Structures are given as structure tokens and as C-alpha cells.
């Protein structure tokens, strides 16, 4: 990271980092869509790709307000998360388990983004940049919505995946003696 002397410079770096992260996602999400088996997952990822493109425009607006260039930085954190998530697309697994892997990777992305947006919001609020704060909060709201949707879909697919396993694949249930029962 370059030498920084002010909170304004820190905010500029955060915006550039978020911009890079969102740009990287516009290339990664289509691969997730192509790999997903579940139609609802495909639809959710497609909707989030459209949202991501709007978030990029919003970050460009913020960069204009801050009189900075949004590009020029590579978000290495998102690079790593995307690289790790790409492994989910190479796993040989039943459809449900495969989709669970995609959702797990997508949830990591959302949490990383939320942390970045919350940090940028805190700085913008302290600098009393209300328009910037509002735009960042709009994106944070979308990211939280995407995470909530992924979390819910993950839970539903997980139940299906677990209930679809054969009884022989599960370890036998251990019976715990009822120590509260009266013995006569």
C-alpha cells in the first residue's frame, strides 16, 4: 500500500480496492452461473451479476465525488477468494454438493465485500461525506441482501443433500442412556 497521510487518502484506497473487487467479480460470477446446476442458484447469481455492474457504476460516481480515479489498484484479497472459489467449480461431486460449494464460495465473497463497504462507510461518515456514505450504504444493503439470499438457499440445499444421503453412509446414532429415568 502506498504511503498515506490522511483519512481521505485511506478512503480513496478503500474505494479503489472495492472497485477492483467488483470488476473481478464481473468476470468470476459468469463462471459460477455456468457451473451451477440449480436453476434458482443460477437466477440468483445472474441477478447479483447485474447488481455488481450497478455497484461498479456507483463506485465510479463515488470516485468522481472524491476526485480520484477508481481504477489502478488490484484487490489481492478478492483475487485470492476468487481463486479459492474457482476450485469449487472443479470438484467432482453430486449436483447438490457441487452447488453448495459454489454457494460457500459466493458467501465468502459477500462477507469480504461487506467488510470493505462497512470500513469505507465508517471513514466517509467520519469525514462527513454524506453523499458518498449514502451510495456506499446502498451497496452494503445490496450485499447483505445477496448474503441473506445465499444463506437461505444454502440451508435449503443442505437439507436436501443431507436427507438424500443413504442411511448406510451416515454413522449409526448413539443412544445415550436416560440418566433421569427412575430405577426401581
Pin down the residues of each PLM region.
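Amphipathic alpha-helical hairpins
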Residues: 1-184
